[in-house]
Amino acid sequence: MARSIKKGPFVDDYLVKKVEKAKASKDNKPIKTWSRRSTILPDMIGLTFNVHNGRAFVPVYITENHVGYKLGEFAPTRTFKGHKGSVQKKIGK
């Protein structure tokens, strides 16, 4: 179920302050965050966020297409190694 329109998008307060500070100072340093649950707002376009995926920080550059999504959607937490195949398939026989 989607979030109610009357509530508005969720963004952590500290993250909004960091975005405003970065926009005011024209700073190109990435903003480090653990807040994967925050929604990407139009104010964030052009900024780079380092989003934590549980192990490392993944750089995410925000464009217009990202608006409305969550930060965590662009920092995958699981690595897919592929399905196990037989040895003959790998050799090519």
Curated annotation (Swiss-Prot):
The keyword Ubl conjugation does not apply. The keyword rRNA-binding applies. InterPro entries: Ribosomal_uS19 (IPR002222), Ribosomal_uS19_bac-type (IPR005732), Ribosomal_uS19_CS (IPR020934), Ribosomal_uS19_SF (IPR023575). One of its GO terms (molecular function) is structural constituent of ribosome. Keywords: Ribonucleoprotein, Ribosomal protein, RNA-binding, rRNA-binding. GO terms for biological process: ribosomal small subunit assembly; translation. GO terms for cellular component: cytoplasm; small ribosomal subunit. It comes from the Bacteria. PANTHER family: RIBOSOMAL PROTEIN S19P FAMILY MEMBER, SMALL RIBOSOMAL SUBUNIT PROTEIN US19M. Protein S19 forms a complex with S13 that binds strongly to the 16S ribosomal RNA. Belongs to the universal ribosomal protein uS19 family. This is Small ribosomal subunit protein uS19.
